[in-house]
Structures are given as structure tokens and as C-alpha cells.
Amino acid sequence: MTQRISLSRRQFLKTASVTAACGLLGLRESFADMAGKKNRPNILWLTSEDNSIFWLSCYGGTNCRTPNIDRLAKEGFRYTNCFDNAAVCAPTRSTWITGMYAISNGTQPMRSRNNIPHDVIKYYPDLLSKAGYHTSNWTKTDYNIGGRPDKECWDLLDKNKRFGWRYRKAGQPFFAVVNSTSSHESRAHGDAENTHNDPNKMKLHTYHPNLPAIRKSYAKYADAVENMDNDIKQTLDALKEDGLYEDTIIIYCSDHGGVMPRSKRFLYSSGTHCPLIVRIPEKYRDIWPAERPGMAVDRLVSFVDMPKTWLSLAGTEIPKTFQGTIFLGKDIEPEPEYHLSFRERADERCDCVRMIRDKRFAYYKNYMPYAPAGQYLAYLWKIQAAPAWEKHHREGKTNEITGRFFRPRVSEEFYDTVKDFDDVHNLIDAPEHQNRIARMKRAMRKKQLELYDSGLLPESMRQRRAQEHNLTIYEMARDPKLYPLESYLDAADTALERNSADLPTFVKGMSHSDSGIRYWAVVGLHLLQNDAIPAVRTLENALLDESDEVKIMAAWTLVKLSRKETGLKCLRDLLNNGTTTHRLLLNVLDWMGTDAVPLVREYLTSNPKQAKNILAKIAQDHGIEISK
């Protein structure tokens, strides 16, 4: 039965006026929304590969000339404190595409292609497309993520269509990535003769010895950076030609630092301190980050901030999963106090480092200090500077600073990057900095917990654990029963202290039910060196551990404690019979030096086809002949 509603004339007029007002308000909001969408800026993101601020003249670089980037800086705003999170391409681009630190996703090891829950984690180009933007990418993806083709998130990704905005609908706002590979590390490979830039005029980092091969490598890469600068010009010229220069926010940055040895892949300033220049047309001057173009901006910016900021500039949805801070625009967020970077496996080489810094000071925690930073890495050694530097060191010609790269590391480092951009004067024990160091250590731990840092287990161990429970590493790291991060952080910190008073703690930890705790316990025993002799029986028992990561570290420690036969037998069995962590085993055999030579010689004599990468380098360094 329909209920009849009776209204007086006054009630009717009142209701009608309210309805009309609501309609007008809705119409006004609709027009405002349409106007807002109509005025949305085009965004052009120019990226170059592998160059830190060291190489650009607008940042004070003297080795080459970059007039086009310099001009962009004069027309825009030059950020002086922009830092990459990973110091190498694939983990960086994983961070960019998801708006999340790769360590939070489990995508931090180079070329790992670990899966993530794609129903939870969104890619920023998808969100821009959903909001009406035309998105294009020329032509760099390399997102290091499994479960989805990289190109799927872009409206246009075609190597033959460099200027993607030319393929949008009329009047459609665009977000275009145009990447230059001209400054990629590979451009410094091989012969370095007949360079345009003079090797004798190159300014070297203080950690590099003054060798002709190193100077030539610098000059060859300086040529590459100048070619990259010309790529930037070509793209900007195309934008001007299309009449879009004053309608487009232009962003330029590199994807990380590099490329001379000890920059790319390493979390020092030369690997992480990157250029960031933003040109904002006059029509959008209300979001200028400084009073006028040409000015420097000293705000602290992390690469993880970028995708969130781009979405904000476009007025699009920003998922809660995005972990950065909006550093530009109407919705700018408070400046963070610190930036966090991470390092894990790069190609065939295992490592694990975390770095936290502000605008001046940087604190590092080396989770694998028993390994030198300067490990042979096949791709890096294609630059003449790398083998030349290594040879110089092996001949005993390096000093305390130039030789440190090839020696085992301390557990912690701390640098004043304003006075010491090259990060060579470790101030970790300086009395005047102890309060600051303590604050930064607390901030690092807090951030690791906030991000569910997945790197506190060896790569193979965390992959295995996630697979056993049919989970992604992202999901596993958020399950405290499977991944008790606080306990791992505590265990790692205790191990890295190298305090002989912790021997009973390590011995007890070796019988823990969690292989992660056992791993950090054996690392602690390893770092105690001869102070671990009372734990020899415990280490021998660990050779039967169900975790090969624990076995390998226990065996190496026994070799160092003069129980060579016992330790080498375990390593021999793993090498001959297979292991769940073959890459770690090969790294350890290299780190062992001469102790591993008999084992490697025996193995390669029977398996000459395995003389590749690390094993081939061990053979070369120690004169092991390999039959053809």
C-alpha cells in the first residue's frame, strides 16, 4: 500500500528550494570537477640511467658538460637532497612502479622476479589511466616483479614510439616516461681509448687510485653522460615542437648513481645521491616549491616518494599501500627526517646493507661484514677501471682508503657526507656523534619494522619459507609466526656486535627451532673468530642442520678455526651433491680465499664446464688450470 504524503504550500516551496539548491550545488561541483580535470597538467618524466649528481655540471660536476640539463635546472627547480632507495636498477624500478620499498615486497634482490599480491598492490600507471590520463613509457620497465608482464600497466609501450603523448586522444592529459640508456653502465664497458673527454682532466673519487685505466674509464663514461644530455634535448625539443612545453610539468632524474666501481650497487653517496629537476610552467606557479625558477630546493626526497607525488599532481587516487611522502603540489606532506636505502644481492653477488641518512649524515649497517664490498662481479668488471683497481690492490699498492673496498668490512659506518661526499672517513666511533648515531639506529629499526623489512633472512631461506606456505614474500613477512622480524633484528644486532660475552647466546641460538635465529647465531660465532673456539662442538653439530645456509656458515667458521678437514668435507658434499642455496655456497668459497682452493681445484677438475663466473674467477686468481 502506497503511503500518501501531504505537503502544505510553504513546505512544498521550502522543499523545492532545497532541492534546487542541492541541484545547483551538485551542478557547480560537477562543473568544478570538469574544470579541474580539464586543467590537469601533463607530466613528462625524463629518466637517465646510472648517473649520480657527480656527473652533472649543474650539480658542480666538472668531468663533462650537460648544457641541456643545466638549462632545464635554470628554468625549473633543482633538488639537492634526492636519494635512490636501492642503488641499482631493477629494485629501484620495483619501488617506483608500486610506490613501495622493494624490501617491503620481497623484490629487492636484483633480477629476482618474486611474485607479489597484485590484487593488493597497485601500479601507479594503472591509477593514472583509470583517472583519464594517457600513459606511455619509452622504453624502460625492468620492475623485478613476477605474476604480471611489465608492459601491461601502460597504455603505450613501444620502442618505435618515443614520444608517447603523440598517440593520445585529442585533449587527453598525458603521463609520459622517456628513458635514456645513453648513460647506462654498459657504455663504459670495453675499450676506453680515443675519448672525447681528456682522461688527464678527470676528477677521480678519492677512493680510486690514480691509474691510467681508471682515468680512461671516467673519460669514456663522461662521453656517455654528454650523449645522454643530448637525448634530453631531443625530447624537450619534441615537446616544444608540439606546443606542449608550457602545459607540461617536466621531471628529470636518474634511476640511481654510478657507474665507476663502488658507486652503482653500493649505498654510498656516489651510488644513491641523484639529480632531481622539476620544471613547472607559469600556469601552475601555485605549486612552485621555491620563490622562482632557477632556485635550489633542499627538501629531502626519496625515490619512493615519486609515484605518490605524481599521482597527487594528477589528482588521482592514491592507495594506502603507497609508502612515500608527497613532496610537491597542493597536497604536499611534511618533510621526513630521514631517507632509507637498502642493498641485497646484485647479480651473482650476495650482500645485505641498510643505510639511513638525513641531509648531511649517513649511517650504515652491514649485515654481511665478513664479505668485502668489492667482490668480483662479472658485469662490473667489464669496465676497465674495475680489474685495474683490483690488480693494483693485489699487488699491494693501495693505501688504507683505496684498498678498503677489497677488504672485509666493519659492522657499522657513519659519514659526514657534506665534508666527505666519497664516504671514506668512517666516524662511527667519534665521541661527538654518538648521540646522533644512536638516534639514527633507532630510526632505522623503527622504519624496518614499519616496512616489514623482508631481508633479515638469507634470500634462499625466505624464498623457501614463503613457498612452503604457498605465500608471497610480501605475505610471509607480515606473518609474525613465520617471520618474527623483531627477533631477527635483535639476533642480527647481537651478532654484529662481535662481543665474546655473547658466546653463550650464540650457542643457545644454534638449537633454536627457527632457522633464521640459528643463522644469525652462526654468523655471530663466525664474527667472533678465535673467541668462538669453545663452540667448536656446537659448530660441528650444525653441519647436520636442515638449513644449508646454517651448514655453510658453520663449515666456513670451522675452517677459520683450524678444523679445515671437517669444514671442507661439508662444503665438498654440498658442492658435489647439490644445495638449496648454491649461489651463497659459491660466494663463501670465494670469500674463503686460499682455504677453498684445493676444494675448487678438485671440483673443477671433475666438472670443467662449471668454470663460470665466481668459480672461474677463483680459478683465475689462484692459478687453477682447467681442462678444455
Task: Annotate each predicted stretch with a short phrase.
Residues 3, 13, 17, 34-41, ...:
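Long, internal low-complexity/basic segments
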Residues 2-406, 421-442:
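Formylglycine-dependent sulfatase
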